[in-house]
Amino acid sequence: THFVDQVASLAFLAAHTRTLRLGTGIVILPQRNPVVLAKELASVDVLSGGRLEAGFGVGYVPDEFDAVGVPFSERGVRTTEYIDALRALWRGDLSFSGRFTSWDGVEAHPRPVSPSGPPIHVGGNSPATYRRAVLQADGWYGFATTLASTANALEAIRQNLEALDRPADRARIQMSVTPSEPVNRDLVRRYEDLGVDRLILVRDFRDTAGAPHPERATAVLSFLADTPTTLGLD
């Protein structure tokens, strides 16, 4: 895709912001080496003072999986295992035994700022994603949603909460979405009424691709600074 790498982008943002939460929406987790990714994300978390929120998804483009040598049919089970592996590395577990990744006597550094690691959000709109949100994640993220599709997703998550045993150390699932329609104050309130905790807005910066670095940085940071005022939420 035309998107720049998420971890590199977060490192840039960590250096240019002080209080902004930093997240990925989303890293295609089964395409990554979880041991390497654990170090990369923990490094961003440390450099940002604990502001990282890690967003993961399973992916949906078979050609991408062919290119990295990962069977497309394994993307779900790999995602489930890799989330467990990331948490184990961030906790400091010295061993892990899985179908796709294992280690013994390995200690990962740096450790994230929080002993429990950064919050993990899972993205997607499938029954498996809703189960994963309940059993493994701290939050769910919906991209290009409508009010109707968000209501359906939140209801599916609530049903899974009733049917499954959510780990006792997990707090309430945080609901985040990127709406597909133009955002205004009324739409914000309607998403809030549904039970959404956070709206994540998207700005396409491809129009700045040929500009000098200072101009690109200004475009990104101006968008971040102006967004609350644009929504009428300042």
Predicted regions and their residues:
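Active-site-adjacent structural elements that line small-molecule/cofactor binding pockets in enzymes
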Residues: 1-234
